[in-house]
């Protein structure tokens, strides 16, 4: 086992604090409407330019191992805030730095670190309750656009696009961000349920100009099996032909004789048919077939539950207003499934989301909810260069997370004002002893830090602005973009409550651990390895030479 370097007490804390400050100073220059960019060097390709706090934090590694431990702990704050709310990473870092700096001063002055931490925790718990009380629900498009604009660094077009996307697909809908092809940002909305499977044969195409299959009011056959024998399907095909409607077959696979017969029937115009593979694999495929069945009011023909394809009737088939199938995707528009059944299915999947342990599973389940409950919107980000594209895409992603958080828990006044108001309301809060009272004051003082940093980045005097804001009440604050005071809600400067809450909770959690640190242990730097020089080896060789 490698030898360790151990530091105690003040020596350890000073080193750790230095690391905290290096990382936080790099991150906090990005805060606010007048925050600056940070350029990150990459081992290959062009450097990345960003104003995203967590992207900056992730890039920082310090040479001194003790300082690096401090930096990594603050990086954890930014990462946790990012995971919880998708935004507010810079705010969380600024809060953590303020609490650690003030807290370690108190420790150096002889306060008990454990009581300080208890005081900080007490203040944060009370602050979270106050934030909830200040929170206003965010439901209209204008507020959603404002939240998106602020989070995308005052880019109004991004805010409007996100509000429009949420308007189109609903709050449950999936909104994804992709690279665009032009200079302008675009919004693409897919109505209905879409999945990534195309037609099994190009001979099904009935719209040669678009290369797609479009079927109006079709029946939809759902089968959890491979279909290779056409005899199994004859009863269903005959019934559909009599009804004079088209048929869409969604099965594990359709192959051989069955596929050939369907193609011939389609080309002769006997019955319009199109076949696609079912989406997903294994258990996920079964679940997605069941989703489609719920949406279209059909039944999945599955041998697991004793159903046979030969015995299927028109009652077992789903229906939709329209189905569009192209080379890669199938879209089912306006399924005839009962609303109550769809809502029941959505509730069931939501329960699974709560119980899901992996992020991947959770994401796939959320996609299924969106496809059932809303739709899918794609924001295509336009930019002139790849470097700009990366930076803009990261901002749009942040804005998207912020608007989701706003819809979830509401909004509070932005620009650091909400935390200043919360701190003022908690001025009378006391702990069980004097050291806890100091801890409470440390946390309350730290709550001014985001406002001060926004002002500092705008080139103004933080203390003057902070005092002016504290002298006001309610949503009165400072708009750093226009350098004027007024009602932050009227200015359209809103922060999602969830983002502010998460930033404060994670900052206090990690900062509390750092304040109570008394000892730090790391590997000693490895000295130069002893040189097992060429001479020794060659000596042996010389001996061998003598033997020859």
Curated annotation (Swiss-Prot):
One of its GO terms (cellular component) is cytoplasm. It is found in: Cytoplasm. Keywords: ATP-binding, Chaperone, Cytoplasm, Isomerase, Nucleotide-binding. Coiled coil: none annotated. Belongs to the chaperonin (HSP60) family. Together with its co-chaperonin GroES, plays an essential role in assisting protein folding. The GroEL-GroES system forms a nano-cage that allows encapsulation of the non-native substrate proteins and provides a physical environment optimized to promote and accelerate protein folding. This is Chaperonin GroEL.
